[in-house]
């Protein structure tokens, strides 16, 4: 065997006649036999030929000029031997000699341990069951593919929103896949009334709202700079509104936007050439008009109630919204025969809390067509979801849903101050001329003058005005009026007198209007320039 290799390539003349690939194949064969034979054959090759092979096998652009011939041969043998060992181990684990290509249709992979299945998506790598056909966390439940850079606005998700009946499976799908699926209800030219504004989950069949997805398309279109994405988002919004009877005004606005773009390009936006799609939106003649229609559609959507599986048949009016309470007025339509007693059920919760276990329920009974009721003990500055169901016996007649945001405590305090100011002004008008007339507005102007002249500090001004409008008694207000009248020509003396007399009063704690927590922010809001 040694004599054969010696004859074939054992001298410099023989090796120089061989191509680079032939020399490389011979080196691989020799490394599988023995190190001695490997070195014996390569000893007669030139250093440049061996260095060339070493650079190719090590995949490093190093000249190796500082090594002797024996050192170069030894290093080449070690590298080639390791490669042979690694290839042999791979063959034992994976019998197939062909390299498997990445398959996005079924994104599963055996890795990180024998027999364990993991998602091929590097951003997910979810552990999967052996019988799984796709990754439920990151892949589409229709086409089984995933996106490398997932854009949530291009996906529909089966969520656990309690406005619709049924349990959510939590799966998601591409928006375009849903358009092509008959099970989703989005393929129909005219959707039925029970899923208008909604879509059906292809996996479990649960009804979900598509309004949030519609809003995302319009918002992105309004902010987009590239023509291609701009037109694509408006096209998706147009498809989501196809055949709707519930959102006619919104559909008309989007339709106008589509027509403007069609007139601009001369072709439907679904057939937009790639050359046109690379342009900038602000260079379009119709850009301003299209964005105006998108904004009008968004404004209309914000004013509409959430979609429901049952059409509303009650007239609900929100009479007042405070920090901790909301008052409703319900009027039943005349077309419904309510009987002797009207039965309502109201379910409400914070928008941030989607778990049904935290939903609060109240049963309401009324013998008249009008019912007024107040929901108490709410959290200030919080969005609440309300659902009011009307019954005839045990049968549900209608469902109405809406979101209400409670006011902040400061908003209530400001309203109380404005009411106090109005009362003071009315009382001042009724007083006789020549009598002392000193209302809240005069107090505000006076204290600001003292602050601007450096007689009082900003902190004292805030606390004093808050105390004066919310906590001061009539007697204390009368004392302030006397001081103002007495020291009206000496601002420095007036400031000292107010500080000495009322420093303790303004820091004394009193029960506040409405029983809320103490706040000194009212005067701040009223006095900001």
Swiss-Prot record:
Induction: By cold, especially after vernalization and transfer to warm temperatures (e.g. 40 days at 4 degrees Celsius followed by 14 days at 22 degrees Celsius).
Residue ranges of the motif Nuclear localization signal: 97-104, 214-221
Keyword Metal-binding among record annotations: yes
Keywords assigned by UniProt, alphabetized: Metal-binding, Nucleus, Transcription, Transcription regulation, Zinc, Zinc-finger
UniProt GO molecular function: zinc ion binding
Subcellular location: Nucleus
Protein origin, superkingdom: Eukaryota
Domain Fibronectin type-III: 312-411
GO BP term, example: response to cold
Zinc fingers (PHD-type), renumbered ranges: 137-207
Matching Gene3D superfamilies: Immunoglobulins
Entry-linked PANTHER family: VIN3-LIKE PROTEIN 2-RELATED, VIN3-LIKE PROTEIN 3
General function of this protein: Involved in both the vernalization and photoperiod pathways by regulating gene expression.
Name used for this protein in its record: VIN3-like protein 3
Organism name: Arabidopsis thaliana
Lineage, highest ranks first: Eukaryota, Viridiplantae, Streptophyta, Embryophyta, Tracheophyta
């Amino acid at each position: 065997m040694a004599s054969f290799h010696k004859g074939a390539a054992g001298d410099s003349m023989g090796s120089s006649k061989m191509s680079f690939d032939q020399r490389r194949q011979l080196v691989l064969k020799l490394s599988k036999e023995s190190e001695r034979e490997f070195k014996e054959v390569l000893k007669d090759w030139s250093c440049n030929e061996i260095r060339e092979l070493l650079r190719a096998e090590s995949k490093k652009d190093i000249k190796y000029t500082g090594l002797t011939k024996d050192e170069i041969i030894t290093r080449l043998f070690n590298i080639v031997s390791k490669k042979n060992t690694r290839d042999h181990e791979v063959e034992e684990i994976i019998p197939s000699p062909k390299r498997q290509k990445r398959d996005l249709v079924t994104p599963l992979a055996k890795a990180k341990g024998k027999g364990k299945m993991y998602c091929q998506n590097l951003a997910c790598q979810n552990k999967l069951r052996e019988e799984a056909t796709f990754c439920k966390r990151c892949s589409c439940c229709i086409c089984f593919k995933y996106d490398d850079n997932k854009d949530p606005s291009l996906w529909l998700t089966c969520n656990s929103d309690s406005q619709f009946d049924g349990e959510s499976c939590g799966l998601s799908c591409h928006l375009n896949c849903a358009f092509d699926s008959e099970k989703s209800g989005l393929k129909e030219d005219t959707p039925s009334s029970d899923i208008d504004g909604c879509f059906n989950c292809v996996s479990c069949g649960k009804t979900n709202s598509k309004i949030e997805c519609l809003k995302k398309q319009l918002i992105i279109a309004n902010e987009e700079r590239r023509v291609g994405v701009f037109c694509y988002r408006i096209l998706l919004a147009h498809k989501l509104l196809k055949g709707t009877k519930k959102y006619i005004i919104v559909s008309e606005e989007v339709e106008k936007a589509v027509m403007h773009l069609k007139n601009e390009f001369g072709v439907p936006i679904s057939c937009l050439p790639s050359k046109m799609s690379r342009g900038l939106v602000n260079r379009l003649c119709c850009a301003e008009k299209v964005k105006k229609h998108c904004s009008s559609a968004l404004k209309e959507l914000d004013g509409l109630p959430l979609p429901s599986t049952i059409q509303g048949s009650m007239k609900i009016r929100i009479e007042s919204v405070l920090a901790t309470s909301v008052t409703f007025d319900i009027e039943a339509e005349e077309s419904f025969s309510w009987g002797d007693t009207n039965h309502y059920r109201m379910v409400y919760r914070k928008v941030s809390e989607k778990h049904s276990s935290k939903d609060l329920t109240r049963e309401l009974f009324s013998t008249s067509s009008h019912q007024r009721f107040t929901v108490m003990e709410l959290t200030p500055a919080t969005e609440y979801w309300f659902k009011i169901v009307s019954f005839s016996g045990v049968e549900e007649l209608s469902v109405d849903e809406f979101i209400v945001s409670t006011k902040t405590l400061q908003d209530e305090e400001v309203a109380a101050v404005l009411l106090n100011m109005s009362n003071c002004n009315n009382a001042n008008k009724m007083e006789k001329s020549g009598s002392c007339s000193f209302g809240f507005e005069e107090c505000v102007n006076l204290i600001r003058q003292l602050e601007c002249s450096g007689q009082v500090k900003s902190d004292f001004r805030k606390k004093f005005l808050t105390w004066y409008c919310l906590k001061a008694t009539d007697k204390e207000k009368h004392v302030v009026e006397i001081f103002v009248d007495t020291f009206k020509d000496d601002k420095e003396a007036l400031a000292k007198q107010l500080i000495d007399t009322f420093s303790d009063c303004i820091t004394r704690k009193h029960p506040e209007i409405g029983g809320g927590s103490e706040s000194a922010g009212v005067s701040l809001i009223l006095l900001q320039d």
